[in-house]
Amino acid sequence: MTSWEGGIITSYVNEFENLDGHGHGVKLEPTCNVPYTTFSLQSWRDGLDAKILALKYRHIGTYISLTRDRDTGRVYPDPVHGTPRIQYDMSDFDREHTLEGVIALTKICYVARATEIRAHLAGLAPFVARDGGKRQAEHQPGTDPEFTDPDFAAWIKRLRRADNKPPTAMCVSAHQMGSCRMSADEESGVVDMQGRVWGTSGLYVADASVFPSASGVNPMVTAMALADWISRGVAADLSS
């Protein structure tokens, strides 16, 4: 298996993308499996485990629970010297969604007959198929392995008890959005519907920071569309 080659997100599971009924949840995706991401995200156990894991690299697949978070952080000026500061702590609400996605991923790996499953949580040993994968081979489609394999069920129970709050859990934030959100009025955001900063002449923002909220998906096409829209407005303003 050469999972470090080819596209990084060629499929996804959207069954869990609306866990609260308001569009907040997770998508399950395969991700980039190059060495610096694969091994930097592993929970440290000991040197021997790290070396053995490196030897297994050709057999490793990496997956993520991509969370559309409900709760927000903030960007603010340092009160002393004005340097921009970032404050973001993942809320319990959003962490619960992330954990549900991780649990779903472990079940997908189980039915795909993975012989070892790691959840990137400090202190949580990996699930290892001690019977050589016999129970996985006997798994019936449409059944939940949490209720058919006692060993796997016990491991899932330990996973649910584990604290998935950083720094115990490895969380990665990518594609930051909405720090200069677009809004219909000055009280609700930073820029207007044309990307112009409220109350400032000649200043525009044209990237993912103008999203009204996190999109919950990789935002490249949306960011390009917004940049195209705003840049056309800039051209129109300059020519008028």
Regions found by a protein language model. Give the residues of each.
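Residue-level detector of alpha-helical segments with a strong bias toward transmembrane helices
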Residues: F16-E17, G123, V217, L226, ...
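Active-site-proximal substrate-binding core of FAD-dependent oxidoreductases
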Residues: M1-T2, A119, P126, R232-S240
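A conserved FAD-binding loop/helix module that cradles the flavin
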Residues: S213-V234
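N-terminal export/assembly segments and adjacent metallocofactor-ligating motifs
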Residues: I8, G202, G216, R232-S240
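A glycine-rich dinucleotide-binding beta-alpha-beta segment and adjacent secondary-structure elements
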Residues: T115-S213, M220
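FAD cofactor-binding and catalytic pocket of flavoenzymes
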Residues: M1-C109, E116, P126-D131, Q136-E138, ...
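C-terminal alpha-helix
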Residues: A104, I108, W229-D237
